[in-house]
Each structure stands twice: as C-alpha cells, then as structure tokens.
Amino acid sequence: MKSVEEQLALIKRGAEELLVESELIEKLKRGEPLRIKAGFDPTAPDLHLGHTVLINKLRQFQDLGHQVIFLIGDFTGMIGDPSGKSATRPPLTREQVLENAETYKSQVFKILDPAKTEVAFNSTWMDKMGPADFIRLTSQYTVARMLERDDFDKRYSTNQPIAIHEFLYPLVQGYDSVALRADVELGGTDQKFNLLMGRELQRGYGQEAQCILTMPLLEGLDGVKKMSKSLGNYVGIQEAPGVMYGKLVSIPDALMWRYFELLSFRSMDEINAFKADVDAGANPRDIKIKLAEEIVARFHGEEAAANAHRAAGNRMKDGELPDDLPEIELVAAEDMPIAAVLNKAGLVKNAAMARDLLGSGGVRVDGEVVDRTYIYAVGSTHVCQAGRKAFARITLKSE
C-alpha cells in the first residue's frame, strides 16, 4: 500500500472538498483497507461521462488497496432525490429501478474491478426496518434542520410543496452509511447535505463518522453547463466509438485539461507534460486525440479506439482540420435544424446551399455525415464541416 502522503495526493486529485482531512489521515495511518461508499440511484438507464467522475475516483481508491462499495439505491430511487430540485420528483416503480440497476452494473464494471467491488442494494436493510427502527431513524433529525437545505428552503419560502417522503431521502442515504459502516463516502457537490447526514447519523448510532469527499459536476461539451443528456452536451459511455471519439476531439481547448484531471487515469506528471508541450507550441488537437483514445479504449477496447481514430482521419482526408479551427458561438432560444446553424454560422452562403450539401452527404458533424433531419441541441458544441473546406467548431448557447 502506498504511503499516506501518496494516497492523499491521489484521493484529492480533482476533488472539490475533503471533510475532514485530518480524520482521513488518521484512518489511512492504520494501514487497513477503508470502506469507500458511493451511492447511485438508477433513475435512468444510461450513464454519461459526467457520472463516471465518481466511478473513476472509486477506481483510484481500489488501486490504493481499499474496499469499494457500489451502492445501488433501489429503495431511495423509488423516493427520488430532491437535491437541487424545485419541484417534487415522481417516484419510479420497483421494476423500473431494478431494470435500470442491471444496466448500471454492466456499465460501471468497464471502470471498476469486479473482484474488488462490493455491490449493495439499500433495500436490503430498508425493507427490513420495522416501525420502531424507522421512528428511531427519523428522530435523529429535525424539520428545522431539513429546511436549512437550500432547495427545501427555497421551496418553503415560495410556498412550493415539499412532500414528507422527500425529507426521508437524506435520512435514508445517511443511514446507508450506518448499515455499511462506511469510512469514506463520495458524492457530487450537490450531495454535500446528504453526505454530512451520514456523518451525523453514524455518530448517533455509535459509529466513527465517515469522511466525505465531494467531486465537481463535470462540464458538458460546451464547457459551460454541467454535462446533461437533456442539454445535448454529453458523451454517453455506451455511444458508438466513433461518436464518442468525435465528440471528445471537438471539445474546447481549455476544457481539455479539466477532462484530463477528472476522466483520465494518466498521472498528473504526464498531464503536466502535455500542458508544457502545448505551451511550447504543440497542437492542442494532438493532445485531445490522446484523451479521446484513452476514454474510447476504456469503454470499447484498444482496437475500437484505434479504428475510431483511423476512421476520423479518413473522413477528413479531403480537408484536414486547420490548426486555427474557427470557434463560433451562436445564441438560440431552442434547438435548431443543422441547415439553420450552418447558415447562421456562415459555413454556407445561403439556405439553398445548405439544403444541397445536406442532400448530397456533404455535411458532417464531428466527422459523421448528417442529413437535414439533424437537430443541433442548445448547449452543445460540435465540429461542423460543410463541403470540403468549410470547418468550424460551433457552440449553440441558450438565450
């Protein structure tokens, strides 16, 4: 096992906040594998790279010799996490949750080592909890403390309804840490209240309090808003290798380093060497290719990554991407047809030219041929090619 200092450096890489660092150091000094917990509510079947920020950190803990608990919130998934929500979320059925959970498991083991992962379902203990135990759990916290949460406070102050079951979500998430005797819990920055609940409940149940590690919400391909399928600025981990590759090599240069830190398993020394190369005049696209190949290989294999790179090169053979690829930002109230985007960005002379190119296969988005039915999502960024020589990286921003 690495030294405490080496472990702490890797644990803190890319993290937003570590509470409490001194407590974690004491846990690490014992030289025993820690129990590292992260919970995921299977409310949607498909994961994107934003979800993998936590999973990547779990893998780093595994590589340090610790025990990872991948908690599937099949019970909490039927409640619906109210974090950051301005309205009550409709709960899912048990069947929907379990179906999504199976899909989750098949996806996360492309990152986690199955032999070093304990998969748990919080229905295992919550379904067995009787009325007396449940009352004991709810007595650990007050309504006044619950209303300290920003989202609950905003809804309460604006007379928006808050269902009683929504108060139960952070309590159940916190109790998961009691049931699993977690030493460390990971979560997004929007989960801090729930993670702190775990610390408080563990003390209430006579356990040593867990440390919490919050990870940032990954920016989407536009580099502005958080990655989200609904915003169209995402990279799904089950997307085809070529699509995944094309999206990653088209991200803004400044965003590349953020993705390296949170998504790559390369050492920070290697990443800093890449930065030095770019500062010395290297083409940022060459570095983005390394990032894209690494991530595609993780989910699809080395051969698929090599094929995606080769195919992208073949698609661009009639006009290599220029080093000074134009960056164009458009503003729109809603998603736009690709023809309108090309016209507004100036890649075509007029709407008629856009229609002709789309009809003849002369328009590519991230290297893939598209037709007139292609819709450009607000919040997304793509490399567009109209004809043989007109290229631009176009971001469609919301008004």
Swiss-Prot record:
GO terms for molecular function: ATP binding; RNA binding; tyrosine-tRNA ligase activity. Catalyzes the attachment of tyrosine to tRNA(Tyr) in a two-step reaction: tyrosine is first activated by ATP to form Tyr-AMP and then transferred to the acceptor end of tRNA(Tyr). A motif ('HIGH' region) lies at residues 42-51. Homodimer. The keyword ATP-binding applies. This is Tyrosine--tRNA ligase. Keywords: Aminoacyl-tRNA synthetase, ATP-binding, Cytoplasm, Ligase, Nucleotide-binding, Protein biosynthesis, RNA-binding. GO terms for cellular component: cytosol. Belongs to the class-I aminoacyl-tRNA synthetase family. TyrS type 2 subfamily. Its EC number is 6.1.1.1. It is found in: Cytoplasm. ATP binds at residue 229. InterPro entries: aa-tRNA-synth_I_CS, aa-tRNA-synth_Ic, Rossmann-like_a/b/a_fold, S4_RNA-bd, S4_RNA-bd_sf, Tyr-tRNA-ligase, Tyr-tRNA-ligase_bac-type, Tyr-tRNA-ligase_bac_2. It holds the Pfam family tRNA-synt_1b.
